[in-house]
Amino acid sequence: MIVSDDQGYNDLGCYGGTEIKTPNLDRLAEEGTRLSDFSVTWPACTPSRGSLLTGRYPQRNGTYDMFRNDVCDFGVVLDKHRYAVSPEMIGGMDTREVLLPQVLKQADYRCGIFGKWDLGQLKRFLPLARGFDEFHGFANTGIDYWTHERYAVPSMRRGNRLTTEDKGIYCTYLFEREAVRFLKENKGEPFFLYVPFNAPHKASNLDREKKWHLAPEEACREYPRPKSKTRMHRVQFMASVTVMDRAIGRLLDLLDEMGLAENTIVIFFSDNGGGGGADNGPLRGRKGHVFEGGVRVPCLVRWPGRIPAGAVCHEQLTSLEIFPTLLGAAGLKPPENIVLDGFDMMPVLEGKAKSSRKEMFWQRRGDRAARVGNWKWVDSARGKGLFDLAVDLGERHDLSEEKPEVLKMVKGRFAAWKKQMAEAEPRGPFRDY
């Protein structure tokens, strides 16, 4: 399972990107199926990642916002004592939640994560306590690509231990190295490899100019020299995606070399819509928004012999489906004592069934959105309206006044969902307020 960070819907050649170079992701699309209508549960990092590992809405699993120090984003430097008790150091995914690798262990899967964890930094929240056997990466929301620091705080970990042994190595190269090692060492047994790259997320650096230092210089030179700051941001963004693409290609090649491609599911998607430097066209909005540009993301799935090659799936699917789908592929059933919000989407990907996903809901603080069929209602600080996604994917034409009965229906479904989340036990944001 490969996850990019803040990559836009149009930031792959196979999704229509004309200038970005992603030959290996395009190859993955040719050898597998491209999903055109795939959404995540939250328009930013942490809750989205929590959902894909639990199969549950953020409002059900309790991770419904970021574990983050907002003051750092305004240039405030915390000393080590203040940082130690800050939100991003003490928050984490509720330990009562059952994560995907914990269930896969029942079938003796070897589980490794190399990259961005983002679900808590205390020992009880870290990957080794949540079902993973190996972890090399960082546990907070973002770091500098070379120093591996978050606002001057060392953040890279090997296992539970903070380390500076690889300082100076570009993050994507580091995560590729560890993922390759993991595959080679575990090729003879069942494995779950999770590679959540931090590319192309902005760097978390106190120097605002270095926030846009996303890619090695040699990768940037593959694109025309930028003539403006805005264009420079775009080139850095594209170059970081291209480097990530090559790392993905190395993993795909290795699966081929080891004779494992036929028996390995490969899933790629972005954790949310693209932010600065991204191309979300033709969608409205971006990272942080509940419009499609914040929640609809590129997704590719390959399983030779099971999932059609070169196909496009237009069925509505979400990241909530990943947990039950991978368990099903491993011959496992979800724990009976937890409520899942997703379903096994393998029959849909195989072309044998229609999606049972008929509705989807989002809430990010005061922003709300609901989708029932192709009807999408948005009520946010960045805009409101009722949209028919079947003919208005860009959410430009508000039909609230023309379709009051539809608006009432969709808002009613959102109210019912919110009531269900409020009653979710033992977690959920509405229990905390």
Summary of predicted features, one role per range:
Residues M1-K384, L389-K419, A424-Y433:
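Formylglycine-dependent sulfatase
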